[in-house]
Amino acid sequence: MRLESAQELKQRLLTDIIIPLAAHATRVRVAGARAVATAAVAGAEPLTVFGVGARPFDKVPQIQRSVALGVARHQGEYRLAVRVQRPALLHSPMLEHVRLQAKGEVEIRVVGRIDKRATRVRAATAATAHAATPWYQRDMRPLLIGASVGHYKVTAGTTGAFVKRGTRTYLLSNNHVLANEDNAKTGDWILQRAAYDGGKQPAERVARLRYWVRLKKTSANSVDCALGEILEGIPCDASLLRGIVAGADRHLAGVGPGFLDVGATVYKIGRTTGVTEGRVTAFDLDNVVVNYDVGNLRFDGQVEIEGIGTHSFSDGGDSGSLIVDGDIQAVALLFAGGDTGASNGLGLTFANPIHPVLKSLKATLLS
């Protein structure tokens, strides 16, 4: 189908089916939790209410994982991208209705749970415990794209890029890396390397938190981003992408086009997996529900990427990585991923398109 047709179909199905059903599921779970609380006051056993083991009201996620919809391609034709976040929905009447409405022009993948990518930083195994620490997990002066960074209370994330806002220079990464999911305050210290990688205060202080886009808990987000103002005397190299293509250094060539099509080859440098190559598998994905410490959050307008070969494109700790295209232009900011859904049997990565990121922060990319 044509691109416009795929986008129109996606929006209609989201509005008429997916979002209303997800909202209904949330209301049912909240109602069940309230019933549990009421039953507890009355001395009843929680498991007898509604025949299910509803959870306490304050622990019910406000947004439920269901199905994300976007745009994919098959043999040159656009089609509806269907991303199932709860495997139990794979054979549901809802999904069958989506198939029928799309007249079979769908690409369905079970992606399961999606997490922010600053979590699950894995401890070294016996095989890697004595390996040399890679450069992107060490102190880097000048500051480099791809290096370990984080709010002093956050485990570890990645330095995405460097930007200008007014006359000041800032470090770009995710909200959940620099602003601790809105739990930080303006002026908080940013460390490079991050605390998980041994960053200490005051030695590794490189920036102060200045600007971030707050995360919405009950409506759709489009970005997860924040800026740290780089301290006087801390140098940065705003263009070097160390070993980004086939082990060779390249230099960032500015901001890429707003449209990132399926099949495009992309690269990133991240704190955990270093340099990886991937391909875009879907774009304009809406209703992507991501697990954060503050609960499940919904994102619209996202890009989906899978790793090329036998590796995932990202892992926990790669949050905030700048994603560049084949022309080494910035196209997206990595923020989330899962363990399933890619054609190589591994997980998928999700990213904010770079244009909304820069616009929301009123920033200009340095290169």
Predicted feature residues:
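Protease-domain processing segments flanking chymotrypsin-fold serine proteases, especially trypsin-like
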Residues: S5-G166, Y170, N183-K217, L231
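Hydrophobic alpha-helical scaffolding
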Residues: Q85, A253, G270, N344-G347
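Solvent-exposed loop/turn segments at secondary-structure junctions
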Residues: A88, L178-A179, G338-T340
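Surface-exposed flexible segments
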Residues: L90-G104, S239-R250, F350
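Serine endopeptidase catalytic core focused on the charge-relay Asp
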Residues: T133-G307, V324-G326, F335
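C-terminal subregion of chymotrypsin/trypsin-like serine protease catalytic domains
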Residues: E304-I305, S312-F313, V324-S367
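Short, small/polar residue-rich loop motifs at catalytic or cofactor-binding pockets
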Residues: D315-S319
